[in-house]
Amino acid sequence: DDISVRQEILENLIDEERGDENHPELWMRFAEGMGKKREDVKNTVAIKETKELVDNFMKLSKDDRYHVGFSALYCYESMIPEIAENKIDGLKKYYGAKDGEDTLKFFEVHQSADIIHRQVIKDLIGDICDTDEKKEEALRAIELALSSLNNFLSGMERVYC
């Protein structure tokens, strides 16, 4: 029960939830910038693959072995800066989004903040996974998280493309 680990989790959560420009709010502004009404976004029913993604991440993050939850978080956060960069490029090229607009802010924040988050989490996992068993559990968590993320994207393609 290492307080430094809990502090890192808390710091990550504070970064995402604090202030008027918290991550859920930035996502809503992105959706509005794409022409969606806030109320419509809030009332959207999740597709099967989205529900499975959320369920798997919740299961992993609530696991008593916190290296399992950290591994799932790392799987996600490790990809985000590059994904955000690609999203920004696509939104500019295909949708006419401009730097500094609310439409891009969600991705701009993740492009920079998650570079730090992923390194901190990677270092913590390296410290925490001090046995072969923990390393195997971490890898299994990453595999489930990655599979869930890929399935989520397949669901988006199935429904919206």
Language model features with spans:
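Non-heme di-metal
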Residues: 1-161
